[in-house]
């Protein structure tokens, strides 16, 4: 069976000997919903960073839909959509520019990118803000923009790091339905 995500004996030791991860094993089947829960400093963001290849692991292996993250990084990353904890888009670009540009990074044709932008921005109630600069959005709208951006190449696996941070109760409810 090919899993959506396979972590095998995953370890991470930072400089100074701080061990963030110690032998993590996890198999996630396609279609499953998982949450990493734990206190601050438990290694949740480190794990997400390794899965998304933003943080180097110290040991173990990561496979995304069968692709080894070390040996087949391009194929593995094409399967992933990441919504990071921090907003990391150009605040001077418009909402539409941000999502269409993201699709382009993955080779999505401009016409298709425009269609996907309308689809995801509408689903996330941002279509009416498509021509606004990202810096003008509220925190909750920025969070939804990050989700729309992560969906633009239609990944098979969506990774969300603190997806409801700074989001009001009503939006949290709508995000999970």
Regions of interest found by a model, annotated:
Residues 60-68, 75-76:
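Conserved ABC transporter NBD signature motif
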Residues 158-161:
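Catalytic Walker B motif of ABC-type/P-loop ATPase nucleotide-binding domains
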Residues 152-156:
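A short, proline-enriched helix->beta-strand linker immediately N-terminal to the Walker B motif
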Residues 100, 104, 111-129:
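Conserved ABC ATPase "signature" region
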Residues 39-43:
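Walker A (P-loop) phosphate-binding loop of ABC-type ATPase nucleotide-binding domains
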Residues 133-137:
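Conserved ABC ATPase signature
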Residues 147:
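Hydrophobic anchor residue at the start of the ABC signature
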């Amino acid at each position: 069976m090919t899993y959506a995500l396979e972590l095998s004996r995953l370890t991470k030791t930072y400089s100074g000997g701080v061990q963030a991860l110690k032998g993590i094993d996890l198999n996630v089947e396609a279609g499953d919903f998982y949450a990493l829960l734990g206190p601050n400093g438990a290694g949740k963001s480190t794990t997400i960073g390794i899965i998304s290849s933003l943080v180097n692991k110290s040991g173990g292996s990561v496979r995304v839909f069968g692709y080894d993250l070390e040996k087949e990084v391009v194929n593995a990353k094409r399967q992933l959509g990441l919504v990071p904890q921090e907003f990391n888009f150009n605040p001077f670009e418009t909402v539409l520019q941000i999502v269409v540009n993201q699709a382009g990074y993955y080779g999505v044709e401009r016409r298709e990118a425009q269609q996907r932008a309308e689809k995801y921005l509408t689903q996330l109630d941002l279509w009416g803000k498509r021509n606004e600069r990202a810096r003008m959005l509220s925190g909750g709208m920025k969070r939804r923009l990050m989700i729309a951006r992560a969906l633009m190449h239609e990944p098979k696996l969506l990774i969300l790091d603190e997806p409801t941070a700074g989001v009001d109760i009503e939006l949290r409810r709508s995000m999970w339905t």
